[in-house]
Curated annotation (Swiss-Prot):
<comment type="similarity">
    <text>Belongs to the universal ribosomal protein uS13 family.</text>
</comment>
<dbReference type="InterPro" id="IPR019980">
    <property type="entry name" value="Ribosomal_uS13_bac-type"/>
</dbReference>
<dbReference type="GO" id="GO:0006412">
    <property type="term" value="P:translation"/>
</dbReference>
<keyword id="KW-0687">Ribonucleoprotein</keyword>
<dbReference type="InterPro" id="IPR010979">
    <property type="entry name" value="Ribosomal_uS13-like_H2TH"/>
</dbReference>
<dbReference type="GO" id="GO:0000049">
    <property type="term" value="F:tRNA binding"/>
</dbReference>
<keyword id="KW-0694">RNA-binding</keyword>
<comment type="subunit">
    <text>Part of the 30S ribosomal subunit. Forms a loose heterodimer with protein S19. Forms two bridges to the 50S subunit in the 70S ribosome.</text>
</comment>
<dbReference type="InterPro" id="IPR001892">
    <property type="entry name" value="Ribosomal_uS13"/>
</dbReference>
<dbReference type="GO" id="GO:0019843">
    <property type="term" value="F:rRNA binding"/>
</dbReference>
<dbReference type="GO" id="GO:0015935">
    <property type="term" value="C:small ribosomal subunit"/>
</dbReference>
<dbReference type="GO" id="GO:0003735">
    <property type="term" value="F:structural constituent of ribosome"/>
</dbReference>
<dbReference type="InterPro" id="IPR018269">
    <property type="entry name" value="Ribosomal_uS13_CS"/>
</dbReference>
<keyword id="KW-0820">tRNA-binding</keyword>
<comment type="function">
    <text>Located at the top of the head of the 30S subunit, it contacts several helices of the 16S rRNA. In the 70S ribosome it contacts the 23S rRNA (bridge B1a) and protein L5 of the 50S subunit (bridge B1b), connecting the 2 subunits; these bridges are implicated in subunit movement. Contacts the tRNAs in the A and P-sites.</text>
</comment>
<dbReference type="Pfam" id="PF00416">
    <property type="entry name" value="Ribosomal_S13"/>
</dbReference>
<keyword id="KW-0699">rRNA-binding</keyword>
């Protein structure tokens, strides 16, 4: 089992699919990585040599923000919006939808479970 960017990559899967187990690498990024390193699509992780795994690791470290760094960057961006007290920051603070969705009905995922109101029975 290869370990890249702090993540154990599954050995029996194709390299293109296995790289997507790393947070911050999707299908497009994985394809770019294997093209840069020169690995064909059909290869599986258990068929990679140590040198190829090292090349993949170096490419990811050099060109991509992944895992903990990406999560930290995202949370810092949200914290910055909240500190600025701009509209988006206030919506994040209140736990409401940020991108203009309606809240009179719906938005239950963001707002949490419905709170019962006294005297509202039929």
């Amino acid at each position: 089992m290869a370990r890249i960017a702090g993540v154990n990559i599954p050995t029996n899967k194709r390299v293109l699919i296995a790289l997507q187990y790393i947070h911050g690498i999707g299908q497009k990024s994985a394809r770019e990585i294997i093209t840069k390193v020169g690995i064909e699509d059909a290869r599986r992780v258990n068929q990679l040599t140590d040198a190829e795994v090292l090349q993949i690791r170096e490419t990811i470290d050099r060109d991509y923000t992944v895992e903990g760094d990406l999560r930290r960057e995202n949370s810092m961006n949200i914290k910055r919006l909240m500190d600025l007290a701009c509209y988006r920051g206030l919506r994040h603070r209140k736990g409401l939808p940020v991108r203009g969705q309606r809240t009179h009905t719906n938005a239950r995922t963001r707002k949490g479970p419905a709170k019962p109101i006294a005297g509202k029975k039929k």
